[in-house]
Amino acid sequence: EQPEEMYQTLAALSSQGPAAYDGAPGGFVHSAAAAAAAAAAASSPVYVPTTRVGSMLPGLPYLQGAGSGPANHAGGAGSHPGWPQASADSPPYGSGGGTAGGGAAGPGSAGSAAAHVSARFPYSPSPPMANGAARDPGGYAAAGGGGAGGVSGGSGGGLAAMGSREHQYSSLSAARPLNGTYHHHHHHHPSAYSPYVGAPLTPAWPAGPFETPVLHSLQSRAGAPLPVPRGPSADLLEDLPESRECVNCGSIQTPLWRRDGTGHYLCNRCGLYSKMNGLSGPLIKPQKPVPSSRRLGLSCANCHTTTTTLWRRNAEGEPVCNACGLYMKLHGVPRPLAMKKEGIQTRKRKPKSINKSKACSGNSNNSVPMTPTSTSSNSDDCSKNTSPTTQTPASGAGASVMSGTGESANPENSELKYSGQDGLYIGVSLASPAEVTSSVRQDSWCALALA
């Protein structure tokens, strides 16, 4: 009854914490072995330091009842005990059927023991560790459930020889995850188990057949400096209306922000223009109003006036009024102060009706070639305007003009023509020479006669 209670205590203690290793080189002592020594010494489980386990181990009841074998050796030389697999027909500890070897631990010698695992704890045994090596997390449950540990005593003890380790580890590799390399050719070679500090951490994912401690270390290193994801604050800054600007006109204030085909922001005016016409709006940047403080104290540097339609600058960069600026530009000298006026003089433009009358008068000056029909018609008009007493000379004058045009070489006809013209002018009875000139200009045949 006592061994079964002790095994239950060992299983409970093995699931609580990792193994405690002995400081002596060449071996280690599991916490389960320490708890077993404490259970044998007292009825209640009391923690016993690992340095005392070597002297208390020969007094364990289940080791004394087991058959002894030639496992005693000196200086770490001798045959290494076997690490059998767990089987259902293996007898429990204390039954006398196990193959456990024991020896008294003395100075310079080490004793090792192994036993079959009981069917009550079907866990795979844990292989021996090298000097100063740590154990992987998967090995604690196996060692705490039913694995046998080796005990070393004295200062010069080492691990046993590696005679039958190769074929035993090959059978263990099928049931255990390949977290390390089990094949060692010398006991001074370090183990490939990943070292740990403090309590072992259970991996978040199940161990695969190709996972190694190097891979886990690379994953832990790569996962440590994780890049900080972009928070929503950066997106919020882009959505703020103060940070937006129209890509077309550069406006930063609009009642409604729109987007073009490429996703850029447009103000309401440019967005509507682009939507309706399919083109970008005219690049009219909003004119910023000049502050009133700049306009209030502004005065002309030449005449010191404060009212002008356009402010200009002189060669020195000083503000001048429009009149002084134009005067300096045209004449090259400053505008005299005597020319200063209180009001603003605007340009006097002529009405458009005068221009039209000038165009009509210019067209009337053009001479029109006279034909016989036009001459007769004009002569008839003139005869109508004359009095009845002068009607006959007027008709004679018309005939003389026709004859004069046809026979210009005859001097008599020319004299008759001029005499007829004199009679014509007398019959019209014009008052002043100005009136005569105006009447001549109105009739085309009179202009030809004066030529």
Swiss-Prot record:
Q: Can the keyword Transcription regulation be found in this entry's annotation? A: yes
Q: Where in the cell is it found?
A: Nucleus
Q: Where is the composition biased (Basic residues)?
A: 346-355
Tell me any Pfam family this protein matches. GATA-N
What cellular-component terms does GO give this entry?
nucleus
- Main subcellular location of this protein, as a coarse class: nucleus
Q: Which InterPro entries match?
A: GATA_N (IPR008013), TF_GATA_4/5/6 (IPR016375), Transcription_factor_GATA (IPR039355), Znf_GATA (IPR000679), Znf_NHR/GATA (IPR013088)
Which residues are annotated with the PTM Phosphoserine? 126
SMART domains noted in UniProt = ZnF_GATA
User: PROSITE patterns in the record, alphabetically?
Assistant: GATA_ZN_FINGER_1, GATA_ZN_FINGER_2
Compositionally biased tracts (Polar residues): 356-394, 402-413
Residue stretches of biased makeup (Gly residues): 94-109
Cite the SUPFAM superfamilies for this sequence.
Answer: Glucocorticoid receptor-like (DNA-binding domain)
Query: What molecular function terms (GO) are annotated for this protein?
Result: DNA-binding transcription factor activity, RNA polymerase II-specific; RNA polymerase II cis-regulatory region sequence-specific DNA binding; zinc ion binding
Crosslink position(s): Glycyl lysine isopeptide (Lys-Gly) (interchain with G-Cter in SUMO2): 285, 329, 340
Briefly, what is this protein's role?
A: Transcriptional activator that regulates SEMA3C and PLXNA2. May regulate genes that protect epithelial cells from bacterial infection. Involved in gene regulation specifically in the gastric epithelium. Involved in bone morphogenetic protein (BMP)-mediated cardiac-specific gene expression. Binds to BMP response element (BMPRE) DNA sequences within cardiac activating regions.
PANTHER family found in the cross-reference section = TRANSCRIPTION FACTOR GATA FAMILY MEMBER, TRANSCRIPTION FACTOR GATA-6
Subunit structure and binding partners:
Interacts with LMCD1.
Listed name of the protein: Transcription factor GATA-6
> Which species expresses this protein natively?
Sus scrofa (Pig)
Gene that encodes the chain: GATA6
